[in-house]
Amino acid sequence: MSGEDRGAPYRYAGERPPAYPADGYASYQRGLKSSIPSRSYDTAYPEQGYDRHLRERVHPAYTTGPSYGVPPPPPTDYRRPPPQAAYRYEEDYHHRRAPAQPHLEYAPEHRRQPVHSDAYREADDRRSFEQARSDPYASPSRHAYQDSYRSELPHERRHAPAAYERISVRDDARSAPENRHIDEPAVYRRDEYDAHSREIQPSYRRGAHRSPRLSPQPVVSAHERSSEYATRDYSASAARYAEPVHQPESPPRPSMSIFNMLNDRSANGAVESVHSSPTKSSIAAEHESYPTTAQEPSHASRAAFDPAREQSYSTARDSQAYSRGSEARAGAARVNYTVHPEDEAAISQRRNSSAHQQSSIKSVRHPANAVDEPLIRVKHEEATSASLDAQMSAEPPVSHTLNNGERLSAQDAKVATEDSSLAANGNGKVDSAGGTARPAPAKTQLKLRNNPLPASKSNSSFVAPPPPAKKNRDPDGWESDLSNEENQPFWQTELDDYIFDVRERQRLIEDAFVASMREKHVEVERRLARAYEGRYFAVIRQIRLREQQEASQRDMERRQDHVRQQRDHEIDLELLGTLSDGQQNMGTRKKKGGRGTDDDGLLQADDDDDDDSDDVALADLAARNGSKSNIIKLKRSKGKPAAADPRNKKRRLENGAALSPAPGSEVDSTLADFGGNFDGDDSAFASHQASPTPDDVSFALDVDASGKVPIDARRAQQLEDAHRRIWTTIAKRDVPKVYRTVLQSASSKTMYWRRISSVVQREAKRGAARNNKTVKDVQLRARKVMREVLVFWKRNEKEERELRKKAEREALEKAKKEEEMREAKRQARKLNFLISQTELYSHFVGSKLKTAEAEESEETAGSSKIIDPNAQPSDATVLPINPHSELADAEARLAELDDIDFDDEDESNLRAHAARNAQEAVRLAKEKAQAFDVAAAEERRRNEAAAREREGLDAGPVKQIEEKDLGKAFDSDDMNFLNPTSMGQTEIKQPKMLTCQLKEYQLKGLNWLANLYEQGINGILADEMGLGKTVQSISLMAYLAEVHDIWGPFLVIAPASTLHNWQQEISKFVPTLKALPYWGNVKDRAVLRKFWNRKQISYNRDAPFHVLVTSYQLVVSDEKYFQRVKWQYMILDEAQAIKSSSSIRWKTLLGFNCRNRLLLTGTPVQNSMQELWALLHFIMPSLFDSHDEFSEWFSKDIESHAEQKGTLNEHQLRRLHMILKPFMLRRIKKNVQNELGDKIEIDVFCDLSARQKMLYRGLRANISVAELMDRATSNDEAGLKSLMNLVMQFRKVCNHPELFERADVRAPFALADFARSGSLAREGDLLNLPDSTTSLIELQVPKLLVREGGIFDIPGHNSRKGFDTGYLQNLFNIWRAPHIHESLQEERSTFASLPLIGVSPSEAQKTFHSTGIKRILAAAAEERHWRSLEAFASDDTFAAASVRPLAKMLRPMPTTSGRSPSVLMPLEEVAADYRRHSYLAKDSARAVVAPAVAPPIKLYSNDGPFMQAQERFSRDAQVSVTLFGLSPEGRESVKRVEELQSELPEVPPQGVMRDSSIDQLPYNGMQVPQMNKLIVDSSKLAKLDVLLRELKANGHRVLIYFQMTRMIDLMEEYLIYRQYKYLRLDGASKISDRRDMVTDWQTKPELFIFLLSTRAGGLGINLTAADTVIFYDHDWNPSNDSQAMDRAHRLGQTKQVTVYRLITKGTIDERIVRLARNKKEVQDIVVGTKAYSETGMAKPQEIVSLLLDDDELAESMLRKKQAEEAQTAQEKADLARASHAKRRLNKDRAAAAVESPAPVGSTWSLEDDEDDFFGARPPSKADTDTAETTPQLQSKKRSVGGGGGGSGGAKRGRISEVASPRMTPLSLDDGALMASGEQLASPSKGAAAKRKSKSHRKKTVDELAGVDLD
């Protein structure tokens, strides 16, 4: 595993020094920058493999490497980057063992031989020396033998952490697999490893303490580095390592690693320490684990230099035993480093001469000069595998220049530098010239003053004591007892010994290095020699194999010829009779298919098979080569090829099998030797065959003296038989065969001749075609020209046709536009005619009604100031009409009017018709009213006459009076419209029967209403709410009854909430009029209909009723009954209820038979102009008959202005006001009512609570802006409903989160049975059921378990078992009074709290031994007793204070508690106070509710005593009475109370639980939502809570309006919690309840709040007792809110009215209020002067504007606009590109037509590379296939067949019946690629085809002519 995988390795930040190939490790030379790149192991040895599963190197038999010190050429395999060093903690791997090496365990014998190079061992010595010198406790890398690594800087290595060790970190993931890890060898240590550890000890002792770990220092000079060991600070030690157990008091020693290594070396013996190689010590040391505490003191040091350990590790690692387990590795090898006798002299000589160092270094580069150098031979006790050094990568060494010009390697230079530096630090003990060293003096043991050295258990001279605790040291780093001058003689001698040992060790290192280098070079030379030899013989092997193959081929050919000759000779001899019997028999056997014993017997062939000789040759070759079993007989069919013969089941032997040498041959053996020595050669010749030997066949025939072969009779018979068989065979087999052959030959010749003839014919035709080519080309060209001309004229005709169509289309569009303009003008004239007619009618009526005078408001009077009457109208408007001039002109031309023609531009005729139609309308209205009056009078007369006849009276005079009165009242002369102001001058006084006094503006309203009635015109009384529209309507009915003697019937239709108000006010103000309330259920209404449904009823003063009051709902349901009656006046209160012209209510009321209609509304225009038209059409159907025309004239411009899309046309607004004024009267409060108090509106903004924010953000996150915009642009009803649903969800969040889900009561599931009663009414008001729950589970217990000795008799924790004997009761009881008394005498008594609570020892004993109920009773009695004495006990002046216990004493003390700032509560009340006031102690703080609860399981058994005991235990009457007290009936009984007092004198009648605190009661498991949480969760409710407190304190009365009834439910819970008195009125309230609630509110001042819904409680009712109105949420129709607030701000209100609006800031609530205020201004446009309008809520765009913020809406609209613009631009660009392509195409066509050469008779010749008539090449088949893809360039040279893939023999010139699908560029039109007889190209591929058509390619005449060449 790499360093990155293992953890956080320490990496060098600077440049890493290169790795050198001398020893596989890296050496650092200061100031040296090598240009040789470092390479990994695989780079140095690319032929070696890497086994990732074993995580080890797989060693080949031989490798290549540098030889003779010459660096090898850099290899080409750079599969791995250079390795990188990192540190690891050695303690991390103390439990791991060294990795096994199975490849060494199962390797061949020659690969398991130890190959230890002296050069490698010397490098290991030097590396171990460097590591030991820097830090004796830093072990080398355990896996240095696997990968080469780079050495760190000396100062970094010296100051590295002690427990760090270095491993190779590969940057390449392929070279460092993930499953690779660092293994730790097993902990093993032998005594011989530590026997030398105390040989040469200095004055200080070696211990387990480590040298201080210093931070990295900057690089110092060579001199400073070499001498820095004398100035290091050794005052600190690593505290992380434990001290040895057997060395507790040894002084600390400085961390000089060379001393430790010398001590280890000296402890191993003189001979072994001098001549031991340090190569193995570093490896052994890195696999050594730290010693345990159980080891001896000699084992404390583990990181010092130990050659024996190192060699043992190396030996154990390379052995088979080491790879098989740690047990075998512990004693795997024992290495004895001794000096060979013949090398002792050389070593001694080299020890005394320092100059020998350079000569040894030279030997590295010149091995020939180092032959005489002595070698250190290592004696192994056991054979091991190749050492680590043989596996390291080989790099060319970096050399340094010596003084004499020689070049040294980097390792030699460093060794030389270190030798010189060490020698320089020897204080003169070493000769400066490097000569012989002074012999070391005798070692003197230092006698320390404090700690004498104990005897060592090893063979060393002394054993140092363990280090003591840390002491202070002087600034030089040495301890004071050694650095003094008086102790210098003790350590000076050892210092001299150390210097001498350094020199000795340096020489040893040099000797080992030279020997290892020499051995390494020899080994490398041997490996290279074998490698080159293997490569050479591989080449020779191939050459020999090739020569053998050639020789075998020649030999085979020779043998085949020989065999063929032999067979021919045998046939001749046989025919001649010279063949012997033996030979004849052999031949017969061969012919029969038998096999002979010789070589030829292996083959079987027919006699006449021509290829038998080949088989014989193969058999002979196989027999001679020893591979007869490999021969496969190939039978050839007779007269047919071998592949067609089904009997040919054997294939021929491959030629390669015969060419390869036979296995086991000489050549094969020779080549196999190379294969065994060279594993890297993977030859294809796995097995070799021997070369065949020549075939030697001789024939021996017997001849006579004359040379003839003698033939006897037998021989003659044989020959005759042979001849017969031969001829028979020939006749039977060969003759048919020859016949077939002859036939086949004849047929083959025929076919061949035919083929020849066809070829000759084709060649002849080709020549003829070449001659006739000119004529053919002329014809083709003429045909092409004709076709192209035809295409041109077709295209021309098409273009002309398109131009004609385009001109016709433009003409039609122009005519259509002109017709539209004429129609628009016609419609404008028609609309102007209708408006003019309406204006004239309004002017005639208004002059009589005096509406302007009746209003008397600034708003109406100032209209002429704001709107300039002289302003010029726009193009779509007409000049103002002068009614007088128009009427005069109409009278003058009345008889000569032409028909109405709206196409005539002269509008004078239209104005005349408008005036006449207006006059006619007035006349018709008058006639209708007169007819109604006449009919009503006649009916009244008949009814009265019938009544008088019944009474016996004369009706004649009365009839005359009525007719006279009618003539006076309705004189036709008074209704002359030519003088419209004649009737408006009459002033009407207040009727006398009206009991109230009308105000001035109300009296003017009465005059206006009377004029409407007298003119027979309907009207709208649109006074602002609260100005007395109801009383004005009642006064009108009184006026008609008093003046005109019209007593009805009058129909008043009002909302259900105002029906009682109408009835009360009619009875109050006009008692003479009889009001009939018509509401109730079906039966009630049937009874009421008897009063007004009678046939003969006279509506006079004595009529059963005069006014019928009902609601809109009942009118619709009882429509048929209302239509039977002719109503004199129909008054609609709150007329906005019929604002929808499509509703059933509007249509039903429009069909009623009535003389006049009066609409009462405070908001004539609410949402749209359509509602205004609905009201106008209701009062004047003849004028406002078309809603489309009305909307065309007014609605569009006004609503577009409201949407801020344009400016309002002031002329249109003025004309609208002119039309409405005669029919509508509107006054506002501020202008007509001065005594009414002001109305103040205050907006209260609230922030969302935490819960509301969470819900609001969740809803916003689930909304897609794009989806909202799509829904806004669509007119889908489902989308609109979805948007409205979203709006409601957001409004719920703003109002209260509980509207989504109520926080209901949480309680566990109770698995129990509760008490039941038969009837609650029978039980009375009080039902006491304490302890009534029982378990639903009954467990039947056997008798054996319940009887004595059973399971239920086992003592429990509350059992009293054992107390009957007295021992537990007396001896072992601590609650005995004597024991308590004795314990109180002690200092820390257990019962010290008893005196504080006033309990004596006897009382404590009594309480302990009493039962639980007695304890409860005693505590309750004590509590009651002190409660009665509490007032006296707390005062010291009373005697009761002397007996109070200490726990109840009160001492005034200052405290920080806000509840009791100066009093410290008694001790006994601390817990109770915590339970009462701490939130954590309450039940509401419980976060977990049990899922289920149940009482104890009920046990049942057949044992009677057991059941009785269970019943007593669960139903103890005494316990029940004590806890719950007497029943309510028992408490009233004196006798029962006395019995309880006598039985339980300390128990009160109500029980002890009644007096207990609630926090002491058991937890019931039920969680009830806190009302405080209900208030806090909603910001509006929290703000309302504060506001209501202030209003309640100031004596205000409040109306609170809501939009949702569920919110009213939550508000009721809040009011109950705050204990406010309130009323509630919503749509579900009954009519009678509404009347009573309004009455109670007006008469009962103790009622504080009235909860109302905006729709139900805001219409018509009088709630002037309230002076404050609060809107909890808002309606987007501002009229509803205005009506709601006017319930309090109306006539009769004497206080100032304050309106509060609770608005949630930054939410949909705020946007609804803003939109409603915009809609509120619509009245100023319709009936006022402000130029602003409203918008309806039905538009999806407005709903989206509520859901989104302004920024989001603007951004989404901007993105949508940008997308539309981008799409439009893209379409324009596509159109421009298409037109541009078309122009370019036409241009290219014209250029091609101009540049193409004209045809000249017979000189035309169309070759493959020649241009056609228009200079383009025809498309090939490949082009046709790729026409829809990217165009590709076509080569000029193409095949005759018209395609790159056609064959050369394809036919040419054949004309196809179907034209080519590929068309010429002339066939393209508008960028589309069209083909003759083919479908159009797809639109998506037109661009590619278009680009393809532009390529100018040559076309053949055939393709231009539409022929297909194949």
Swiss-Prot record:
Compositional bias, Basic residues, is annotated for 1888-1899
Catalytic activity, as annotated: ATP + H2O = ADP + phosphate + H(+)
Q: Which InterPro entries match?
A: DBINO, DEXQc_INO80, Helicase_ATP-bd, Helicase_C-like, INO80/SWR1_helicase, P-loop_NTPase, SNF2-like_sf, SNF2/RAD54-like_C
Documented EC number(s): 3.6.4.-
Where is this chain compositionally biased, Low complexity type? 321-334
Give the region (Disordered) as residue ranges.
1-487, 548-611, 630-673, 852-878, 1760-1910
- Tagged with keyword Lyase: no
Motif DEAQ box per UniProt: ranges: 1133-1136
- GO annotation terms (biological process): CENP-A containing chromatin assembly; chromatin remodeling; DNA repair; DNA-templated transcription; regulation of macromolecule metabolic process
Polar residues bias located where? Answer: 257-266, 311-320, 349-362
Question: From start to end residue, where is composition biased (Basic and acidic residues)?
Answer: 49-59, 118-133, 167-199, 222-231, 374-383, 548-572
Function statement: ATPase component of the INO80 complex which remodels chromatin by shifting nucleosomes and is involved in DNA repair.
**Alphabetical list of PANTHER family matching this protein:** CHROMATIN-REMODELING ATPASE INO80, HELICASE SRCAP-RELATED
Q: Present the record's domain note.
A: The DBINO region is involved in binding to DNA.
Protein's recorded name: Chromatin-remodeling ATPase INO80
Q: Which organism is it from?
A: Mycosarcoma maydis
Report which gene this protein is encoded by: INO80
